Amino acid sequence: MAFTVKDILSIQVAPALGCTEPAAVALCAAAAASLLPEKASIEALEVRVDPNIFKNGLAVLIPGTEGLSGLDMAAALGAIGGNPAKSLEVLGEVNPEHVKQAQALIKDGKIRLNLLADHKGLFIKVIVNAGENMAEAVVESMHDNITRMALDGVPVEKSSLIAPKESSKNARAAELESWLKGLGLKHLMDLLDDLDDEDLAFLEEGLDANMKLADYGLKHGPGLGVGKTLDRLMRQRLIARDMILDARILASAAADARMAGVNLPAMSSAGSGNHGLTAILPIKAVHKYLESDHESMLRAIGLSHIVTAFVKAFTGRLSAVCGCSVAAGAGATAGVTYLMGGNANHIADAIKNLMEDLAGIICDGAKSGCAFKLSTAAGTAVQAALFALQGVKVMETDGIIGASLEKTTQNLGALSTEGMIETDRTILKIMLEKQFSPD
């Protein structure tokens, strides 16, 4: 089965409010709670998650909560005030009263979080008990993919929240990833020829959303304030302004805002809001230094999303490797190289340069420190493109770099899915020890 660029954007790119993992848990809880009688009083709520959902949802702040975090809070908010029809923007209507009620549930010990330590792949199950009723929902494979809902043990057969099995987003995403793995870079680039006005408008929407996050981060300096600090250092003339620095500033400022729980949506890429920031914002930063037109920038962003999806097909949706660095970073450097007039060879060289530079960066969960990693990924994406256009490219004799971009990406996928299994377990072990240590 072949896919179009419109299919890729539809499956891989979507708005998300707050970090994607807590949003997915909130969505699952909201879907389950929607089956209960109106105004039912929640007596118990159980959340079961795979290790990577647990890792990425442990420390990141939740929008609309004035600095609260945790998957238990996300689930409670989703069940109390979430709107499952809004998918990953499920918490967009949460208010202070909902937060107060969620805190009470947690304080009273009514929320239980269980880690499914041996589960492979993205998985969330929420069970809500209220009076004589028990409702449940399951999200799996993709953050917004609700595969099951049931009330009192009876599966819900018809719901607008559950896609028909024959056309489920999960199945389409799996087919897309399998299809992408068989493509070369030239084919990926050819997909851009099919971008229409509707697609360009959607790409513009994503750019606008992510720029709002960057602008907020620059103005207010939430979280660690990495973007605002870089901007201040530049204004103090302690570091020099160039396109690399501007890319770092935009990406990190947006990450500062998003990881601090600012109530603004991000346009995600490959299921991750931070991937979306990395895939889009460096291209915007570079554009103002060039004479290229606005549509060319949007097409470069389109290529970035395509390449990000291509790399993620090999590395997996969640792993011990920082996808913002190697997947969205690859997308960004492809887009930047394209915008600068590079050909397929230049783009392949740029991506290989970036992978050689960033392949070792681990994912130790979503949190404020991700702003540093997005800063690094964005700056390296621009630098890798500039190097490639100057004829600098990593040789195939070096480490995991292969003779082609496709082989290099396969090698990176093997590193991510096979080589980093124990790394992921160790990261999670350290995080769990911190979370439950009496110190």
From Swiss-Prot:
> Which domain of life does the protein's organism represent?
Bacteria
Where does this protein have coiled-coil stretches? Answer: none
Which BP terms from GO are recorded? L-cysteine catabolic process to pyruvate
Gene Ontology molecular functions: L-cysteine desulfhydrase activity
**InterPro entries linked to this entry:** Ser_deHydtase-like_asu (IPR005130), UPF0597 (IPR021144)
What family name appears in the similarity comment? Belongs to the UPF0597 family.
Protein known as? UPF0597 protein Dalk_4447
